[in-house]
């Protein structure tokens, strides 16, 4: 779990919530707020099945990006959550890896709609209602991407089409699971969000890790 030291999207507060919730299901995290610690050493990164990113890190160094991209393309899982789709703006390929980039938001109580109930990343996932930021995305990368949840258009939206909300991608041997959910504790405390991350993490981890898990 790569977070950050910030009062905005305070991962230091939310990490314990998800660690406790998913720890009950034998999904365990190491936590850091340092991009260098998480991505600077390819061997260290390679010890993990999945990297979860929830932070506002503006830049990434070339060697860090190389390690992240190699980790995914060689079979690692990548789970960028919410504001992670804003990260690393100095590396254009990062948006393509995630599948899109955060553009703007408002805020409201809403429920994102599941559009593909049969995808394994949606196993046991149900739509849940909570206050969250109403993300819009840009720089979409449809290659090897499957949208699994959408946010239907709301008052004040710049367009009337459903907004892609949760999606999966594959790149090389790796799997990427992204969701725009996760602004604050109203979401991070929600059991529906816990299940969404659990299913997404297990899918992103890949079949060999799933075999060990079961």
Residue spans of the language-model regions?
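Alpha-helix N-cap/helix-start motif
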Residues: 11, 61, 90-91, 158-160, ...
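Catalytic beta-strand/loop cores that center a nucleophilic Ser/Cys/Thr
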Residues: 20-28, 100-175, 180
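Short, solvent-exposed loop/turn segments at secondary-structure junctions
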Residues: 6-7, 58, 85-87, 153-155, ...
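Extracellular ligand-binding/catalytic regions of CAZymes and related secreted enzymes
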Residues: 20, 24, 43, 156-162, ...
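Helical hinge/lid and interdomain linker segments adjacent to catalytic or ligand-binding clefts
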Residues: 2-88
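Short, hydrophobic secondary-structure boundary micro-motifs
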Residues: 31, 105-106, 212-214
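A glycine-rich, often tryptophan-bearing local segment used as a flexible ligand/cofactor-contacting loop or short
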Residues: 58-127
């Amino acid at each position: 779990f790569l977070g950050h030291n910030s009062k905005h999207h305070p991962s230091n507060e939310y990490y314990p919530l998800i660690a406790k919730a998913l720890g009950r299901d034998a999904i365990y995290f190491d936590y850091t707020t340092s991009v260098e610690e998480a991505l600077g050493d390819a061997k260290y990164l390679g010890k993990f099945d999945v990297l979860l990113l929830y932070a506002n890190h503006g830049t990434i160094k070339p060697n860090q990006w190389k390690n992240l991209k190699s980790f995914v393309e060689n079979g690692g899982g990548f789970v960028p959550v919410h504001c992670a789709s804003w990260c690393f703006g100095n590396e254009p390929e990062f948006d393509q890896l995630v599948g899109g980039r955060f553009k703007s938001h408002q805020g409201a109580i809403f429920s994102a709609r599941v559009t593909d109930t049969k995808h394994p990343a949606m196993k046991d996932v149900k739509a849940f209602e909570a206050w969250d930021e109403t993300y819009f995305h840009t720089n979409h990368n449809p290659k090897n991407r499957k949208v699994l949840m959408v946010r239907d258009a709301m008052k004040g939206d710049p367009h009337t089409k459903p907004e892609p909300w949760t999606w999966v991608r594959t790149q090389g041997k790796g799997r990427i699971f992204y969701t725009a959910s996760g602004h604050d504790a109203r979401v991070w405390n929600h059991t529906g969000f816990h299940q969404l991350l659990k299913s997404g993490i297990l899918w992103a981890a890949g079949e060999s890790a799933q075999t060990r898990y079961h």
